[in-house]
């Protein structure tokens, strides 16, 4: 069902690329994709979710830093936060037809083999997206982490915040315990998503912003996991 739903998503994605739509109108498609597949996960696998802290979402464009441990949050990002740009390998944009359609959503295309200049690409393109009224989604761990694990957060999101003044919103969850990385197996339960208070980068260094975000996210994940229902039975 996941693959079938994704197939329908790409069909409508290609169709939308042919129409003169605004980014808000185009975003209806990935939002519907995320909502429909997470709904299917609930109906078929008994895997539901709750979202807390939505009152913390700023009314102006912001940068959301997400814990990354599962495929699930790549679906949820489409409806948990307002229309936002996410980063991807620039090679995706080069895929015939599909890459062209994806580019209409204004992703941040990064040459990940470029080392430090990849951070500069992220900041430059991220600044443009924020100026256009879009948010920016960042997974600072850079890859999906196993449950209970993390590593030093990448600095690109925090650096973008410091250079633009955009607030950073940390987002924690326990999805990796129910839908593990590199696995299609989903365990019944409830994923808890918690949106943290915005971090104002004014007067802070990128390192300080990053540390505050990581400390909050990792502490909140530990709290979620320790609570009743925080892990599968």
Locate predicted features.
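Generic preference for hydrophobic
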Residues: 51, 64, 86-87, 193-195
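Catalytic core of membrane glycerolipid acyltransferases/transacylases, capturing the structured
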Residues: 12-35, 42-44, 59-115
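Membrane-interfacial terminal anchoring regions of lipid-handling membrane enzymes
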Residues: 1-19, 28, 32, 55-57, ...
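Short acidic-hydrophobic, aromatic-tinged amphipathic segments that line or gate anion-handling sites
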Residues: 51, 108-111, 201
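Short gly/ser/thr-rich secondary-structure transition/capping motifs
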Residues: 43-51, 119-120, 174-177
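Short amphipathic alpha-helix with an adjacent loop that forms part of the alpha/beta core around
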Residues: 53-58, 125-128
């Amino acid at each position: 069902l996941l693959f079938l739903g994704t197939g329908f998503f790409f069909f409508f994605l290609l169709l939308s690329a042919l129409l003169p739509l605004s980014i808000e109108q185009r975003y209806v498609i990935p939002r519907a994709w995320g909502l429909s597949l997470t709904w299917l996960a609930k109906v078929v696998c008994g895997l539901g979710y709750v979202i807390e802290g939505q009152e913390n979402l700023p009314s102006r464009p912001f940068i959301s830093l997400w814990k990354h441990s599962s495929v699930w949050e790549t679906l949820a990002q489409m409806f948990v936060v307002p229309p936002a740009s996410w980063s991807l390998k620039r090679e995706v944009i080069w895929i015939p037809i599909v890459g062209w359609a994806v580019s209409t959503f204004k992703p941040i295309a990064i040459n990940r083999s470029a080392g430090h200049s990849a951070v500069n690409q992220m900041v430059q393109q991220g600044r443009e997206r924020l100026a256009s009224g879009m948010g920016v989604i960042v997974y600072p761990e850079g890859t999906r982490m196993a449950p209970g694990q993390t590593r030093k957060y990448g600095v690109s999101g925090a650096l973008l915040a410091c250079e633009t003044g955009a607030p950073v919103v940390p987002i924690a969850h326990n999805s990796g315990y129910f839908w593990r990385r590199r696995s299609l197996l989903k365990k019944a339960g409830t994923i808890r998503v918690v949106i943290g208070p915005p971090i104002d980068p004014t007067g802070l260094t990128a390192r300080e912003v990053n540390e505050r975000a990581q400390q909050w996210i990792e502490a909140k994940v530990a709290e979620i996991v320790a609570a009743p229902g925080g892990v599968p039975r």
